[in-house]
Structures are given as structure tokens and as C-alpha cells.
């Protein structure tokens, strides 16, 4: 199975493309085109035009979680699509999400649009904590259990409930997996619940062990180096062949992973275009 991945929004960019804090990837596999996240709001549409991509040809949208840097482009994307489209996500994407940024202890970080507005533009939300099959071999992995003893959710992320700021458990965090004949290809949003936990869930959902590639955010930028080391060790033990880091991985963690994985590591930026399997 050939898989094509076009990165439309990411923190850094290839020459001539627009970068912004966030993530958006167009994934083409098994006869379907799926837009995975929409970035902060500007880059995805801008870069899609540069690539000559007609977003009206997209079959479905998958939202990895409810943070604004993954959902901020939804309005513009739906306006460009000009049709009814299924959006697959966890119900908690609508939670009141906040983050602690610098001296601001209550910075709103959630989905920036009302559901009614998005539905008026053609969105049909399929909200579930369970895996969703886009095809038999291309699916979302559902809610991710916290299995490892070292992967923790960022303590600077919160959910407002009944007027109180509580730690956000990020139950809405999800990923996609493609069951290719050369191994699993896992598409990550932020991996807030841990990249190893995420890959284990992808294995469980598919019943397959071999992981060909994991591409996307790993949320290691705020993690201690000890976690980087344990993550790298587990990735090797799991036999992950390629690792494409994006977004919330952070430069220092990405540099560490590049040292650990050598030629099997790559950065996935705005303007990147990949065809799998790699040759």
C-alpha cells in the first residue's frame, strides 16, 4: 500500500511554505484522503494552495484533540471544502481547555469555534471514544490508556469544570493508524498521553506489532531528558523503523532523537511531502 503524507501546517517550514505553531497533515491511503488536524488557522489553507491541493476532494477530517493549534483552521477549511464532511473526534474536543503560558495562568487553549457555526459550514461530527474505521486498514485508534510508568500529561494544561481549573487528562487525544503490508504507520497529533502509550494502542486496535513509522507530534518539548531516554529505548524495543518528529517534540528533544535514530529520524515540517514506503 502506498501512503502519501503532505504536511500543511507545522512550527517550522520548508523553503517557500508558511509555518505556524500547530499541525495539519493530509494523509492519502487505501483510496481515501483524510485531513488530520487543521493547524492554528492560517498555514494549512495557505500551503494547500501552494501545493495545488483542492480541499473539496478530502473525504474526512480527523481531529487529534481539542487544542486551538489543531482546530484553529477548521472554519477556513470547511469554507474551502464547500460540502458536508464527517469530522471524527473524541467528545471532549469541546471541553473548556486552558494552558499556563508564562505569567498567564489561564490562557484559553480550546477549540475556537462554536459547534453550530461549524455545522452550518458543513461539519458532521462523529464524536466517539472508540476507534473509527475509515477503511478496513485505515482507522483512528480511540481513547488511549495510560500504560507506561513514565509518560505523564503536561502539568501546565487544564480543563475548566464548574468554575474550577482541573488538570486536563486529555482523554480526547487520539491518533490514526494505517495497517500497511510493510508495517503500521501511525499519525500523531501531539501524543499528549505519551507516544509509547499511543503506539501500544495502535498495536492493540490493529492486532499487529510491526511499526514502520510514527509521524507527528510527541510532546517531549516540556518533558525531562530522562523521559526522552526512556522513550527512545522503548521505541527501539518496539522496533519502530522510522520516526518523523513534528510540532511539540521541540528542538532539543528532536536533536536527541536524531542522535538515537540516525538516518531513521526525520523532521516533518510545513511543506514536507512523503511517500511511504520510503525508498
Regions found by a protein language model. Give the residues of each.
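Active-site-proximal loop/helix segment associated with metal-binding centers of metalloenzymes
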Residues: 104-112, 130-182
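Active-site metal-binding loops of divalent metal-dependent hydrolases
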Residues: 10-12, 38-41, 66, 91-93, ...
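A structural motif corresponding to the C-terminal end of an alpha-helix
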Residues: 117-125, 179, 238
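Active-site metal-binding motif and surrounding structural segment of the metallo-beta-lactamase
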Residues: 43-94, 206-213
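General small-molecule cofactor/ligand-binding pocket signal
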Residues: 6, 88, 124-128, 139-141, ...
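Active-site neighborhood of divalent metal-dependent phosphoester bond hydrolases
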Residues: 92-121
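Conserved beta-strand hairpin/beta-sheet module of binuclear metal-dependent hydrolase folds
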Residues: 3-51, 169-188
Amino acid at each position: 500500500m502506498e501512503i502519501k503524507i503532505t504536511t500543511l501546517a507545522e512550527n517550522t517550514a520548508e523553503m517557500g511554505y508558511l509555518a505556524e505553531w500547530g499541525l495539519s497533515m493530509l494523509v492519502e491511503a487505501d483510496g481515501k484522503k483524510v485531513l488530520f488536524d487543521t493547524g492554528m488557522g492560517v498555514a494549512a489553507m495557505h500551503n494547500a494552495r501552494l501545493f495545488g491541493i483542492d480541499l473539496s476532494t478530502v473525504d474526512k477530517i480527523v481531529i487529534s484533540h481539542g487544542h486551538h493549534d489543531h482546530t484553529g483552521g477548521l472554519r477556513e477549511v470547511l469554507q474551502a471544502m464547500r460540502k458536508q464532511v464527517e469530522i471524527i473526534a473524541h467528545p471532549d474536543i469541546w471541553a473548556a481547555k486552558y494552558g499556563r503560558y508564562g505569567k498567564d495562568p489561564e490562557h484559553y487553549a480550546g477549540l475556537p469555534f462554536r459547534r453550530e457555526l461549524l455545522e452550518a459550514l458543513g461539519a458532521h461530527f462523529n464524536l466517539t471514544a472508540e476507534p473509527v474505521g475509515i477503511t478496513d486498514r485505515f482507522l483512528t485508534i480511540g481513547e488511549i490508556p495510560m500504560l507506561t510508568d513514565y509518560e505523564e500529561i503536561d502539568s501546565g494544561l487544564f480543563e475548566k469544570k464548574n468554575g474550577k481549573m482541573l488538570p486536563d487528562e486529555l482523554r480526547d487525544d487520539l491518533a490514526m493508524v494505517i495497517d500497511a503490508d510493510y508495517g503500521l504507520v501511525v499519525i500523531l497529533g501531539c501524543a499528549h498521553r505519551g507516544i509509547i502509550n499511543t503506539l501500544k494502542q495502535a498495536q492493540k486496535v490493529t492486532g499487529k506489532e510491526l511499526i514502520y513509522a510514527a509521524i507527528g507530534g510527541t510532546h517531549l518539548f516540556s518533558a525531562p531528558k530522562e523521559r526522552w531516554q526512556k522513550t527512545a529505548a522503548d521505541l527501539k524495543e518496539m522496533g519502530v523503523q522510522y520516526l518523523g518528529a513534528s510540532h511539540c517534540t521541540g528542538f532539543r528533544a528532536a536533536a536527541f532523537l536524531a542522535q538515537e535514530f540516525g538516518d531513521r529520524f526525520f523532521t516533518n515540517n510545513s511543506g514536507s511531502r512523503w511517500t511511504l514506503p520510503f525508498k
